[in-house]
Amino acid sequence: VTSTRKRRIRTRGRAAALVGAAMALAASLVAVGGGTAQAASCTATTGPYQRQVEQFLGRPVDGVQSVADCTAIRSFQATYGITPTAGYAGPLTWQTMSVMLAQRAAGTTPNRDGACPVDLGRIACVDLTRQLSWVQDGGKLVYGPVPVRTGKDGTETRTGHKRIYYRDIDFWSTLYDVAMPYAQFFDGGIAFHSVEKSMWSPPGSGGCVNMRPADAKAYWNLLRSGDDVYVYGRKPGT
């Protein structure tokens, strides 16, 4: 191969390398630009609960919406089934966060105010206001508290003193055409049962007390037909 031929090969090799590098740089710029454009697309305005939502999410609290605020709010909404998932700090988003804060505050003493009877022995308590449930025996906490998802506006979980009257570990609802594992009925068609969805997903159930699978299973093992259930409070938004 002549020296001229070698120079041509080297020149073409360098040109190909430069083209490859340019293409890689262009691809990276497109990726970065796409990410920036995606973040910038979160353009919800400042909401009425901006400061509260910022504080809950650990964002800088200035009461003014930013792209980063919007993105964080939108992620929270997507996680907990809040629609529209727009990143707006509105009433429903703050309502969900408020319930979570109340649940955290309950700690291991959910009945510190004595609202659920302590003179009936073993009893399952359901606090609609905080969307919490637990099992106690007298003043002793046996299980929980755990988050629950109760009836939405129009199909509220009814309050009062009830008793479990029917149990079916593999119950199938012909009304809703859906499985209701670990179903324990205590008020007509209202039951504790397991669901495969977020406990904070609005607007709520058709009246039943939805539970996470592990919690519904624990209730199944702890409770029996004839055991007391006490439902009190009012679910936010109903």
Model-based region annotation:
Residues 40-100:
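Short acidic, glycine/serine/threonine-rich helix-capping segments at coil-helix boundaries
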Residues 79-84, 103-107, 143, 157:
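Secretory-pathway/luminal and periplasmic proteins that interact with or process carbohydrate-rich
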Residues 89, 93, 101, 130, ...:
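A mature extracytoplasmic/lumenal domain signature
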